[in-house]
């Protein structure tokens, strides 16, 4: 058996830099920007992709997906605490110490140094956490700014039930 045999799986370019945007535009392919971990060049990359896009056999006009870390909970406080898992995970990447997804903590400030906080906050700039109403507003702003056709969502939530609940709430927000 050959996975995907007989299907027409579209080719995408996933990038976190301007080069990926230029390549996707030149090849006339859909472009997914990895703003869920490298958001600094997102707006410029999306703009370059749209400006330089050349139609292809696969795609007649630009098609953009942006990535975002999104954690939705019933309360702002619960979402903030759940988000500390992502903050710890990215801090570990900065330190070069990977590991399993850590449980949330009450006091993230005691986990990282000011320099780590600054670096991680920059990496997580396209990350939203909050109640459904908060997330609805933040997503509307993101989608309006990027004019993205699709959204790729990452939810690094330690507790499985909380992760499922987050996606349930996000689905309600997206309706």
Where are these regions (language model features)?
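C-terminal helical cap(s) of enzyme catalytic domains, especially alpha/beta-barrels
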Residues: 44-52, 160-175
């Amino acid at each position: 058996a050959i996975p995907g045999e007989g299907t027409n799986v579209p080719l995408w370019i996933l990038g976190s830099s301007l080069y990926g945007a230029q390549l996707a535009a030149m090849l006339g392919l859909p472009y997914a920007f990895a703003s869920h971990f490298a958001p600094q060049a997102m707006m410029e990359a999306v703009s370059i992709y749209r400006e330089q896009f050349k139609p292809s056999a696969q795609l007649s006009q630009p098609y953009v997906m942006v990535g975002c870390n999104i954690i939705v909970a019933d309360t702002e406080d619960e979402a903030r605490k759940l988000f500390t898992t992502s903050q710890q995970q990215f801090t570990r990447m900065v330190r070069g110490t990977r590991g399993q997804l850590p449980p949330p903590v009450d006091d993230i400030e005691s986990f990282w140094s000011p320099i780590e906080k600054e670096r991680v906050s920059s990496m997580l700039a396209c990350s939203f956490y909050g109640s459904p109403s908060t997330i609805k507003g933040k997503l509307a702003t993101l989608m309006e700014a990027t004019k993205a056709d699709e959204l790729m969502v990452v939810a690094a939530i330690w507790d499985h039930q909380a992760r499922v609940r987050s996606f349930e709430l996000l689905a309600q927000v997206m309706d």
